[in-house]
Amino acid sequence: MRIAKIGVIALFLFMAFGGIGGVMLAGYTFILRAG
């Protein structure tokens, strides 16, 4: 459930920021997962 909860929060933040902010957040998250 923890992963699902984080996913929902991440999606909410992505929609909240939107635009360049959302892209930067997504890129940062991708770097964390890749690293």
Swiss-Prot record:
Membrane-spanning ranges: 6-26
InterPro entries, sorted: UPF0387_membrane
Entry coiled-coil feature ranges: none
Topology with respect to the bilayer: Single-pass membrane protein
Taxonomy, superkingdom: Bacteria
GO CC, any one term: plasma membrane
Keywords annotated in UniProt: Cell inner membrane, Cell membrane, Membrane, Transmembrane, Transmembrane helix
Location in the cell: Cell inner membrane
Disulfide bridge positions per record: none
Keyword Membrane: yes
Family recorded in the similarity comment: Belongs to the UPF0387 family.
The protein's name in its UniProt record: UPF0387 membrane protein YohO
